[in-house]
Amino acid sequence: MKIINILFCLFLLMLNGCNSNDTNNSQTKSRQKRDLTQKEATQEKPKSKEELLREKLNDNQKTHLDWLKEALGNDGEFNKFLGYDESKIKSALDHIKSELDSCTGDKVENKNTFKQVVQEALKGGIDGFENTASSTCKNS
């Protein structure tokens, strides 16, 4: 009888050990799932307005967006610019390209003057930008 009791106790201990191992496995799996979801959440950072806009621009427009960012200097002004309608931004960047393309040869120093003109023109908003922001390169 004692042997049966001892064997029965050993059987229960083994059975209990198997159940606790299953619990550890399920806890480990749930931890792995939780870790994966946390990694995915950190990887999916929302894109900035600038990044979203850059995806929709061609290479020339991206180049002139960089030029404009440098010209505005102030992040607040640039962020205000990014808040405008996409089509207006694209037309403004195309206008900047055409004006800068005319500043070649002897007129290269006029590019810096054009930066100041652009800064002042954008203070009044993007509407009418093409009329108010013109370089002196075409006039000379």
Curated annotation (Swiss-Prot):
Region ranges (Disordered): 22-53
Organism taxonomic ancestry: Bacteria, Pseudomonadati, Spirochaetota, Spirochaetia, Spirochaetales
Membrane topology field: Lipid-anchor
Protein species of origin: Borreliella burgdorferi (strain ATCC 35210 / DSM 4680 / CIP 102532 / B31) (Borrelia burgdorferi)
Family the entry assigns: Belongs to the Multicopy lipoprotein (Mlp) family.
Basic and acidic residues bias locations: 33-53
Upregulating conditions: Weakly induced when grown at 35 degrees Celsius.
Function: An outer membrane protein that may participate in pathogenesis. Some human Lyme disease patients have antibodies against this protein. The Mlp proteins probably undergo intragenic recombination, generating new alleles.
Keyword Disulfide bond included in the entry's annotation: no
Protein's name in the database: Lipoprotein MlpD
Residue positions of covalent lipid attachment, annotated as S-diacylglycerol cysteine: C18
Localization, UniProt: Cell outer membrane
This protein's UniProt keywords: Cell outer membrane, Lipoprotein, Membrane, Palmitate, Plasmid, Signal
Keyword Membrane: yes
Gene it is expressed from: mlpD
Domain of life: Bacteria
One Gene Ontology cellular component: cell outer membrane
Pfam families: Mlp
Lipidation feature positions (N-palmitoyl cysteine): C18
Signal peptide annotation: 1-17
